């Protein structure tokens, strides 16, 4: 589904992501990483802290959760014309001595509130697997170590970063806001 240039919002807010998993804090980690990748695109985005503060005020004044408030009303409060919603749909962290898996799956969607239209919906996942069949006592120790290394916190950070990169690569950039690089006319060196 192609998105026309007129449909792409210019000022976008990334709302808190829903967590449909048992992993505490994963939605916030994915949202921050997603925002870091999204902020390099030529959209005008609202800082997450400002979005969060205004959402708290909006939820208090309406008595509803952010997911129950119409997108247009959210954008009026935030001063934007587009919203990005997100949901963590799966998270796995498995360690079984000879095998380990670390995985996350998320869904994001962009809404243009001026047109009252969902522009895109993306779902992607990243999984890291490690393991082997040990054939000697030494290889059993090495397999256990390598599978344990796969579920460290740094691996989780890499996995989340990779997921958010993949999602952001699929989001179109508005042409009118693409930053022009300066033309290099001359280079002087010593």
Show which residues each predicted segment covers.
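C-terminal/domain-edge helix-coil "capping" segments
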Residues: 1-8, 74-77, 113-190
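N-terminal segment of the mature soluble domain
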Residues: 9-11, 21-87, 113, 117-121, ...
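Extracytoplasmic/secreted cell-surface and envelope-processing proteins
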Residues: 23, 93-97
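A generic structural micro-feature
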Residues: 78, 98-103
